[in-house]
């Protein structure tokens, strides 16, 4: 583990850019960027277009390591290059800590939750991540209803996989998303917090994790989890809120920083000039940084 990157993730001022839309969500991300499905004829072309978009983001002067602590990449992005370097090396050289999305998507809903599908190639994927100088990973589950068994299952699965990731020398981001429209969202979050605490308490002193959570209904609910000795940092997802709304809610949570995807890229368009693109990205970065650093 890179100690300098660990220090940056633990104490740095800023947020994490989530650039990890995978195959399933790529057409939607491209469409929002202004590229329709009739502009590519196969998956290779689609992934090339999305890599071009990500390259445009990470090479922009607005994508500044003074504001952006880390970036989460999709597996394809890890194996591609930006300006002649593998993406993770390009980011690390720029001062941005690289993470890799490792999950294979969500299973069918059961007990009010969606567990992760099995990650059958996890070992070899983590070996490749180490070869590509990746610092940490991210994997997402989804909680839709107040169901204690379901929430327990989500957290247990996350920690089980997290321990395999830690054993390979990487820092896992555990992401049990709570759907922002869930009927009993505040109650779900209390149950989730208790289960997360159990999981964290089961770790050895040298087993470090990060958490990526939905912004809680009750402000500062996760403050004591953020102070847990095994937690490097807690980041939050935008989860379907507009950027303005997500930023506003984030400002009420002292220890939390953003890890936004859609909310970061929502004003970026393929047809923008370099100046327009850099300004749109810069405005987004500035507002998300502000919500992550300057609290109410």
UniProtKB/Swiss-Prot annotation:
Q: What is this protein's gene name?
A: fda
Q: What is its EC number?
A: 4.1.2.13
Record GO terms (molecular function): fructose-bisphosphate aldolase activity
The record ties this protein, via PANTHER family, to: FRUCTOSE-BISPHOSPHATE ALDOLASE
Q: What residues make up the catalytic site? A: 175, 212
Broad enzyme group: lyase
Q: Which GO terms describe its biological process?
A: glycolytic process
Q: What top-level branch of life does the organism fall under?
A: Bacteria
Record-given protein name? Fructose-bisphosphate aldolase class 1
Q: Keyword set for this entry?
A: Glycolysis, Lyase, Schiff base
Q: Which reaction does it catalyse?
A: beta-D-fructose 1,6-bisphosphate = D-glyceraldehyde 3-phosphate + dihydroxyacetone phosphate
Q: In which pathway does it act?
A: Carbohydrate degradation; glycolysis; D-glyceraldehyde 3-phosphate and glycerone phosphate from D-glucose: step 4/4
Q: Which family does it belong to?
A: Belongs to the class I fructose-bisphosphate aldolase family.
């Amino acid at each position: 583990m890179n100690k300098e990157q660990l220090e940056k993730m633990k104490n740095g001022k800023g947020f994490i850019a989530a650039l990890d839309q995978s195959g399933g969500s790529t057409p939607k991300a491209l469409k929002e960027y202004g590229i329709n499905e009739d502009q590519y004829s196969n998956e290779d072309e689609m992934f090339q277009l999305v890599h071009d978009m990500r390259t445009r983001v990470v090479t922009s002067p607005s994508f500044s390591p003074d504001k952006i602590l880390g970036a989460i990449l999709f597996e394809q992005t890890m194996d591609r290059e930006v300006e002649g370097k593998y993406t993770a090396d390009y980011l690390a050289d720029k001062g941005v800590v690289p993470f890799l999305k490792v999950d294979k998507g969500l299973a069918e809903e059961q007990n009010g939750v969606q567990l992760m599908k099995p990650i059958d190639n996890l070992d070899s994927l983590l070996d490749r991540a180490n070869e590509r100088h990746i610092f940490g990973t991210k994997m997402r589950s989804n909680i839709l209803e107040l169901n204690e068994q379901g929430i327990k299952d989500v957290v247990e699965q996350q920690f089980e996989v997290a321990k395999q990731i830690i054993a390979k020398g990487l820092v896992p981001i555990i992401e049990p998303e709570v759907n922002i429209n869930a009927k009993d969202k505040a109650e779900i979050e209390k149950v989730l917090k208790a289960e997360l605490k159990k999981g964290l308490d089961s770790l050895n002193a040298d087993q470090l994790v990060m958490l990526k959570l939905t912004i809680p209904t009750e402000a500062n609910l996760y403050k004591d989890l953020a102070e847990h000795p095994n937690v490097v940092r807690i980041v939050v997802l935008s989860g379907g809120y507009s950027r303005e709304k997500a930023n506003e809610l984030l400002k009420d949570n002292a220890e939390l920083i953003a890890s936004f995807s859609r909310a970061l890229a929502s004003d970026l368009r393929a047809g923008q000039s370099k100046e327009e693109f850099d300004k749109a990205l810069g405005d987004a970065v500035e507002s998300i940084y502000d919500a992550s650093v300057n609290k109410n």
